[in-house]
């Protein structure tokens, strides 16, 4: 009896302590009264509430002085090309990367020949390779507990449709490319959610099975045989949703007006890659990033931020915006478009296709300020690289300094500026994150930095945890 009373008393004491701890940090009745008392009781606030209650916040926050005609002149501009639409998918990285490759092909032929690459074809192998990356990652970490940070990383997101330019390079080199007309988009390529959900669920199931096989002491050979069987199921699911990858096709290139040039030829995907790209992509470019949290002129690498198990992680040189701008300008002046990525949802006037830090004045509407720096926004998960677009033009002042930039987007030709977006240089500085630059436009001192042994960054880092938020 005494023991029972002691246990009850101990539990009661614990609950009282827990209650006291909660109350000390919670919103008390007195605190709530103070909060309510601090609210302005002006008629203007009542008017603001009535306006916000019936309208979109962005519409009410628009800076009227920024609503004039947008200057569409650019002193440096690469040749225009057709605009694509990624639809309800997170494949912006692929659209931007292939935009660069098809632009390079046209440029190498005096802009007299065009090519449209199949996104569906490359996406098939992207999803198959990411499935293998997950399964092999589970095997490699199978002796760690499920609560381990790396194990949780894999099971949290076994498969996604986001990515980076290193994925385009690795996948295209390994599997080749095919024309869009040979393997066009399917419904699931343009609407990835359900397909991805089903394959993701299957991968998690397989991941648990592989962990059990390791725990039971199965041989590596037996485990690899089973993994191959698992990937066969994934392959079938992808074949039924995206179509089985083309292995050989007949194709004739077309001029700018869509007229066929020459006699049609038969290609394999690898042969078509050699015909259009002409050689390895890896090793020809650097990936620059602006992350003000970390020291500049250092090389970093993001663990497991790759598309294929045997491929390349996202390795980048951290640079000031000014250095990145100068490399971009040099490339654009030579007619070369660039893969780039941004936090596109910030201060975006989507209808006008215009990005400027003064597009919306949320602070005045709510009677507060939003003063965080770029570094602070990254550290607190408030900002990061969310959407890839193709940098295509820059407008320079009399001193050669950038005023504004232009990008080809992948939200369709009816979006923004005929499928493009214009961004002011001040917006570029705040919300630009990644740029892929051919090494011929990179200064020698930065090339030397790129050769450093990279500092490894964990994939849970805030800058990489929000990738692909705004892609769709």
What are these regions (language model features)?
Residues 1-8:
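Bacterial N-terminal signal peptides that target proteins for export
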Residues 18-22:
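Boundary at the C-terminal end of the N-terminal hydrophobic targeting segment
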Residues 23, 217-472:
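Active-site signature of cysteine proteases
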Residues 23-82:
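N-terminal regions that are enriched for targeting/export leaders
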